[in-house]
Amino acid sequence: MTNSSEKQWERIQQLEKEHVEVYRELLITLDRLYLIRKHNHAVILSHTQQRLLEIRHQLQINLEKTALLIRLLEKPDNTNVLFTKLQNLLEESNSLDYELLQSLGAQSSLHKQLIESRAERDELMSKLIELSSKFPKPTIPPDDSDTAGKQVEVEKENETIQELMIALQIHSGYTNISYTI
């Protein structure tokens, strides 16, 4: 490129940046004006809403640029360096848009698959709850400490009964007493 065409290109880039910035500010101001008129007061946007507005502004700016490029492409001049660069930028933008469309399609199918999996899981959970309600509640096995305590109690009762029997035998005068029962 010659020196003058480089200067032209730099000037075009500078003007384009200024145009994009002014247009972005215009869109932001128009959005705020619309929200104020609609709600009769200033609206405070959350971070997510602010980000969505910025994306919308970017899309509007890109649409405006694309429209200008299409108008320029309708009058092709193959010797024009600007035409060639703009055509390359438009092709690159189209390829990026296609990649974005592909990734959004993949994300959409994964999201759909996730929703279907969640629905299947919920259905299986409801079936499991229904089936589990048909079975009796499990009985709680007795604690080992309870059985050990009952065993000690039974042994004490046995000793007491044995002592009572011996006392009865002595009291009744039975002579053939066996002290071990």
Curated annotation (Swiss-Prot):
Q: Which UniProt keywords apply?
A: Cell cycle, Cell division, Centromere, Chromosome, Coiled coil, Kinetochore, Meiosis, Mitosis, Nucleus
* Protease found in the keyword field: no
Q: Name one GO biological process term.
A: attachment of spindle microtubules to kinetochore
InterPro entries, from UniProt? MCM16
Q: Which residues form a coiled coil?
A: 112-171
Chief subcellular site?
nucleus
Q: Which GO terms describe its cellular component?
A: kinetochore; nucleus
Keyword check for Coiled coil? yes
Q: Which domain of life is it from?
A: Eukaryota
Subcellular location per UniProt equals: Nucleus; Chromosome, Centromere, Kinetochore
Oligomer status and interactors: Component of the heterotrimeric kinetochore subcomplex CTF3, which consists of CTF3, MCM16 and MCM22. The CTF3 subcomplex is part of a larger constitutive centromere-associated network (CCAN) (also known as central kinetochore CTF19 complex in yeast), which is composed of at least AME1, CHL4, CNN1, CTF3, CTF19, IML3, MCM16, MCM21, MCM22, MHF1, MHF2, MIF2, NKP1, NKP2, OKP1 and WIP1. Interacts with CTF19.
Q: Anything else the record notes? A: Present with 279 molecules/cell in log phase SD medium.
Q: What is the purpose of this protein? A: Component of the kinetochore, a multiprotein complex that assembles on centromeric DNA and attaches chromosomes to spindle microtubules, mediating chromosome segregation and sister chromatid segregation during meiosis and mitosis. Component of the inner kinetochore constitutive centromere-associated network (CCAN), which serves as a structural platform for outer kinetochore assembly.
Give the family this protein belongs to, as stated in its UniProt record. Answer: Belongs to the CENP-H/MCM16 family.
Q: What is this protein called?
A: Inner kinetochore subunit MCM16
This chain's source organism reads Saccharomyces cerevisiae (strain ATCC 204508 / S288c)
